[in-house]
Amino acid sequence: MPVYVDREAPKLWRRIYSEATLEASLLAEKWKLVLAGLVFQYIHGLAAHGVHYLHRPGPTLQDAGFFILPALGQDKAFFSETVFVTIFGSFILWTFHPFVSHSKKICTVLIWCRVFVYLAASQSLRIITFFATQLPGPNYHCREGSKLAKIPPPKNVLEVLLINFPDGVIYGCGDLIFSSHTIFTLVFVRTYQRYGTRRWIKHLAWLMAVIQSILIIASRKHYTVDIVVAWYTVNLVMFYVDSKLPEMAERSSGPSPTPLLPLSTKDSKNKSKEDHQRLLNENNVADDH
């Protein structure tokens, strides 16, 4: 096995170099869209911080989810964040898997261009809704008596532009309808549902999305309406965007690449059958000529 790994290591680096060259050419073509997507993430964060200046703490609203789900408490608020970070990190790793995997169905740059469009459309609607109506935040740091529930007017423009990072991001209030975490989660899960290849991962991803939604409500980070609105809004937005954008073409397989690890017996037989069928087709074409 060590001998095999030593022999395949140069192939791995050639694969990474080849993929990096391809992705660099795509990035040179699509860099404006990628940059716009990144800039909009900052704009979304700026808006979420800006609405905190308008937030006024008050009694927690009556909520069916709060009635059904017992509060986890402040000491267990990290549960939902742990699930979210797992989903977020796993999705990022998956989008970069073409650099090392011999199975290449997507291009990293193209998949992120599409993801940024999904996010920008959903977050634009979110900005409109949380500026239209500010609800009293249910989170512990947004309740009456908390020093973080209200923030004084900014002293200068720079204070607003810097979003009081990182506290302004972690301890925000007022940006409720609808849940930002749920936007990211559903965009990532639905994107993998469409372009991923592992069925069990798709099922697991949807399960984790449901669990995260439940944990967010149980942590009192959002009202139930914030989660419900996110679920149908993001799905409708992605459906609409997909109907307007051209379908992202799958990568052509071309010549069968050499795998990084030995193929199983079943895979080897399937590969042999494919090679044999390809050879027959080539011979038939030659005979016709």
From Swiss-Prot:
Residues 249-289 are annotated as: Disordered. One of its GO terms (cellular component) is membrane. It comes from the Eukaryota. The chain crosses the membrane at residues 33-53, 77-97, 115-135, 169-189, 199-219, 223-243. Residues 280-289 have a biased composition (Polar residues). Belongs to the sphingomyelin synthase family. This is Phosphatidylinositol:ceramide inositolphosphotransferase 3.
